[in-house]
């Protein structure tokens, strides 16, 4: 197989309802800018996340909207972390 092949950095950040998640989004945006890298913000729906309070659910939604506003591709993946592993090779 002939090369050279295009290569580059990509950043993946997994978000939750934690109040500090918005800070993590901003940090990831700065890192992506420094690396000139595309970035993806994900949340994984599990049995635990389906039991979040309305306030926690709203906070997670706000954090995902912030990531999108700052240039991230955003994904909500139903299921367990194992599904994430099937997604990452294509990123």
Model features per residue range: what roles?
Residues 1-2, 73-91:
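Structural beta-alpha unit
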Residues 4-68, 75-76:
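Small/aliphatic-rich secondary-structure junction motif
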């Amino acid at each position: 197989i002939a090369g050279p092949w295009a290569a580059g950095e990509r950043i993946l950040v997994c978000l939750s309802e934690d109040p500090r998640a918005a800070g993590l989004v901003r940090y990831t945006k700065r890192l992506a800018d420094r690396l000139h890298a595309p970035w993806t913000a994900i949340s994984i729906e599990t049995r635990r996340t389906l039991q979040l309070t309305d306030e926690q659910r709203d906070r997670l939604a706000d954090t995902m909207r912030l990531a999108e506003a700052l240039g991230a591709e955003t994904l909500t993946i139903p299921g367990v972390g194992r599904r994430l592993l099937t997604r990452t090779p294509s990123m």
